[in-house]
């Protein structure tokens, strides 16, 4: 009886590992868009945190020093927004996978 129970656990673990690998691949290929300045600056980022595209509204293009600082701040804010969205998406998708596990509060999975 113990032998059958262990085999069942091993099978479940293998199935979960396969599901997690598939989900990690889906997350890595997913894209999110971070924005700032009401959409004047946007950043498209993959689940691997690779930046695919940065879009800057033409109205922000200027040679003024003050405008340069504003643009730099908006780009940083858009990047941070994209990173937060990638992390939130990852937590939401993996949350269903780990729902039955007894994990300590604040525990982060290594992916």
From Swiss-Prot:
Q: Which GO terms describe its molecular function?
A: DNA binding
Localization of this protein: Cytoplasm, Nucleoid
Q: Which InterPro entries match?
A: YbaB-like_sf, YbaB/EbfC
One cellular component GO annotation, for this chain's record?
A: cytosol
Its predominant location is: cytoplasm
Which UniProt keywords are present, listed alphabetically?
Cytoplasm, DNA-binding
**Is RNA-binding one of the keywords?**
no
Q: Which Gene3D superfamilies match?
A: Nucleoid-associated protein YbaB-like domain
Disordered as annotated region, ranges: 87-111
Keyword Transport carried by entry: no
Q: NCBIfam families under this entry?
A: DNA_YbaB_EbfC
Record-linked HAMAP family: DNA_YbaB_EbfC
Q: What does the UniProt function comment say about this protein?
A: Binds to DNA and alters its conformation. May be involved in regulation of gene expression, nucleoid organization and DNA protection.
Which protein family is it in? Belongs to the YbaB/EbfC family.
Self-association and partners = Homodimer.
Q: What protein name applies here? A: Nucleoid-associated protein PputW619_3586
Instruction: Give the organism, scientific name.
Output: Pseudomonas putida (strain W619)
* Organism lineage: Bacteria, Pseudomonadati, Pseudomonadota, Gammaproteobacteria, Pseudomonadales
């Amino acid at each position: 009886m113990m032998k059958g129970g262990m085999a069942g656990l091993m099978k479940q673990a293998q199935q979960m590992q396969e599901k997690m690998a598939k989900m990690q691949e889906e997350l890595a290929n997913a894209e999110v868009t971070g924005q700032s300045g009401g959409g004047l600056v946007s950043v498209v980022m993959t689940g691997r945190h690779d930046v695919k595209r940065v879009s800057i509204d033409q109205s922000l293009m200027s040679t003024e020093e003050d405008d340069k600082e504003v643009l730099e701040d908006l780009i940083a804010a858009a990047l941070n927004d994209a990173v937060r969205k990638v992390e939130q998406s990852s937590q939401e998708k993996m949350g269903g996978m780990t729902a039955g596990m007894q994990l300590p509060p604040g525990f982060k999975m290594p992916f």
